[in-house]
Amino acid sequence: MRRRKAPVRPVLPDPVYGSKVLTKFINAVMLDGKKSTAQKVMYSALERIESKTGEKGIEVFNKAMDNIKPVMEVKSRRVGGATYQVPIEVRPARQQSLGIRWIVEAARKRNERTMMERLSNELMDAATEKGSAFKKKEDTYKMAEANKAFAHYRW
């Protein structure tokens, strides 16, 4: 284990919308350090959302993020030879990073032609509480509910 807690590095807000969450999302979409490509994909996905829904792209994005953030998750805990799935609350920073990760993973697995289309469709689905990223959140919550009996093993 590390001696000290790692300092949280500051994140600059993105140049178009001024959102720090969007910057983190762009960084998650980025492959091989190609940030400008990731920005193009993300901004064109948000524009596509605007043309499809008529709402502002950033508002749909924020709504999707709020819908995907998990409140509870399970952690494995070994107690005398048995491994229990112990439900725990998720810290806000982890909620955000899990939400981002789940949306990007779900978008990459979709069958649309371009990443921009996949991402915009996944964000629209997440905003309306559909899609595989939302399903992942629901499954995580169900696991936590099912293992509520082991909540006293929390540490």
Curated annotation (Swiss-Prot):
Statement: the UniProt record of this protein carries the keyword rRNA-binding: yes
GO cellular component assignments: small ribosomal subunit
GO BP annotation list: translation
Pfam families to which the protein is assigned, alphabetical: Ribosomal_S7 (PF00177)
Record carries keyword Metal-binding: no
A GO molecular function held by the record: structural constituent of ribosome
Keywords: Ribonucleoprotein, Ribosomal protein, RNA-binding, rRNA-binding, tRNA-binding
InterPro entries, sorted: Ribosomal_uS7 (IPR000235), Ribosomal_uS7_bac/org-type (IPR005717), Ribosomal_uS7_CS (IPR020606), Ribosomal_uS7_dom (IPR023798), Ribosomal_uS7_dom_sf (IPR036823)
Coiled coil: none
Recorded family membership: Belongs to the universal ribosomal protein uS7 family.
Annotated function: One of the primary rRNA binding proteins, it binds directly to 16S rRNA where it nucleates assembly of the head domain of the 30S subunit. Is located at the subunit interface close to the decoding center, probably blocks exit of the E-site tRNA.
NCBIfam families on file: rpsG_bact
Subunit structure: Part of the 30S ribosomal subunit. Contacts proteins S9 and S11.
PANTHER family in the record: RIBOSOMAL PROTEIN S7
Name used for this protein in its record: Small ribosomal subunit protein uS7
Species whose genome carries this gene: Sulfurovum sp. (strain NBC37-1)
Biological classification of the source: Bacteria, Pseudomonadati, Campylobacterota, Epsilonproteobacteria, Campylobacterales
